[in-house]
Amino acid sequence: MTTTPPDRKDVHVAVLMGGWSAEREVSLSSGKECAAALEAEGFRVTRVDVDPNLAATLTALKPRVCFNALHGRWGEDGCVQGLLEILAIPYTHSGVLASSLAMHKEQTKRIVAKYGVPVAEALLVTPAQALADHVMSPPYVAKPIAEGSSVGVVIVKEGANRPPEAIGRIPVTRDNEIMVEPFIPGRELTCGVIGDKVTAIIDIVAAGHLEFYDYEAKYAPGGSKHILPAAIPGHVAERVQRHTLAAHKALGCRGVSRCDFRWDEAKDQLVFLEINTQPGMTPTSLIPELGAHAGMSFGQLVAWLVADASLNR
């Protein structure tokens, strides 16, 4: 016996956005785009700017599905996922465990490396240690362990006499730690997973005045150029796609995810940078672009995510 899917107008979707992380504005942009697209697809949508009263808000709203358009702390690290499990409201994207693991960059490296994904050496140090002297030979990158959108990333250039003071402003973990890893030169490549299918690859070229694919490059109009499909050798594309799918599965991700890599063309060296379980859904974001390249419109993508929503993720 087959069951008829409900009319979309009867499916009440609460789009969670905003919150109070460092990525609030990006989340608001993602959430607004997703909400508008879901309405155009025929769903009944409520926009929820997340605050500490979220449990009470959702209990009153009684949505059938929560579309998670949050980014950063609390929305991307397993916290809101755990709340939705407690409230028994199906939700999109990855679950509690995958979200919490993927948000911790160093733990992510440890896990995916066991599945053959190439990673760079990483050190966990306190800001005081990182400021006292170079903890590794420049060039290197100092970054938060649990932030996205390149928030707080500091590049220490080759020949730097001492660590820059900006390291002292990097957001720290509860253990007062940041992550330091070698600067990997080369091209920035990104690849996604939608469902269980790996996408094409984008070669990201940051605008000339930017050092790397930072917050401005990601979200400002003209901040970067996306070359899709990436003009790279077939053997490199195969490795990127294989490692992207391996990382997605190793962490137990669901829905969509996106992996970022650096490829040093001169050495033919590919290095995994990070995985994103809540990829941006703004007009300049990568997953919508990769979906469109595969023949999936933005409306179809968000509607598929709602259909894919579940508990026990």
Residue ranges of predicted features:
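Short, flexible, mixed-charge acidic loops at enzyme active sites
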Residues: 80-85, 212-220, 277
